[in-house]
């Protein structure tokens, strides 16, 4: 089999935008943990909306106590990590309101966290939000989207198994 037949016949998983805004290259995030892909590969979002939505059908793994980040595992075992902003852990949960809980089953578009975007913009180093695939080594190819995106509607990443 050729590369192309593998590619076109392989299973794919689509990751939807958890926030509305603009896609930024993960390499441009001002935190080396993300820009050097230490925790996985993906994209970042410069958000324009205040609701973080489930990007896949799956199960919430862990919502951090400070509510600035969470993990989610899709029904087909894609492990995602969504981290709102840079140094937002220092806000100790202020500006974030949890709408979901650990181990909760969710569908694409379900609310996970509500943000006070203006407050966080004022207090955080950056509001760029990395969306990374933690188990990226399990996939043959990653296709990243670009441009302006709508939460729960735009595919931001396509993974080929």
UniProtKB/Swiss-Prot annotation:
Compartment(s): Cytoplasm
GO molecular function, one term: metal ion binding
Keyword Zinc: yes
GO-annotated cellular components: cytoplasm
Keywords on record: Cytoplasm, Kinase, Metal-binding, Phosphoprotein, Phosphotransferase system, Sugar transport, Transferase, Transport, Zinc
Residue positions binding Zn(2+): 68, 83
GO process annotations (BP): phosphoenolpyruvate-dependent sugar phosphotransferase system
Cofactor field: Zn(2+)
InterPro entries linked to this entry: Dup_hybrid_motif (IPR011055), PTS_EIIA_1_perm (IPR001127), PTS_EIIA_component (IPR050890)
UniProt key word Transport: yes
Superkingdom: Bacteria
Active site feature: 83 (tele-phosphohistidine intermediate)
Stretches assigned to the PTS EIIA type-1 domain: 31-135
Site (Important for phospho-donor activity): 68
Phosphohistidine: residues bearing it: 83
Primary role: The phosphoenolpyruvate-dependent sugar phosphotransferase system (sugar PTS), a major carbohydrate active transport system, catalyzes the phosphorylation of incoming sugar substrates concomitantly with their translocation across the cell membrane. The enzyme II complex composed of PtsG and Crr is involved in glucose transport.
Record note on domains: The EIIA domain is phosphorylated by phospho-HPr on a histidyl residue. Then, it transfers the phosphoryl group to the EIIB domain.
Protein's name in the database: PTS system glucose-specific EIIA component
Organism the protein comes from: Buchnera aphidicola subsp. Acyrthosiphon pisum (strain APS) (Acyrthosiphon pisum symbiotic bacterium)
């Amino acid at each position: 089999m050729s590369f192309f037949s593998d590619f076109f016949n392989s299973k794919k998983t689509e990751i939807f935008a958890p926030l509305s805004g603009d896609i930024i290259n993960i390499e441009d995030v001002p935190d080396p943990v993300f820009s050097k892909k230490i925790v996985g590969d993906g994209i970042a979002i410069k958000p324009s909306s205040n609701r973080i939505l489930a990007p896949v059908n799956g199960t919430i793994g862990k919502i951090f106590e400070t509510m600035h980040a969470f993990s989610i595992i899709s029904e087909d075992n894609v492990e995602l990590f969504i981290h709102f902003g840079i140094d937002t852990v220092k806000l100790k949960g202020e500006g974030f309101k949890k709408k979901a809980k650990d181990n909760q089953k969710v569908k694409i578009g379900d609310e996970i966290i509500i943000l006070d975007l203006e407050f966080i913009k004022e207090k955080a180093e950056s509001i760029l939000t990395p969306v990374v695939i933690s188990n990226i080594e399990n996939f043959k190819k990653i296709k990243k989207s670009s441009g302006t995106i709508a939460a729960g509607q735009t595919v931001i990443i396509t993974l080929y198994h």
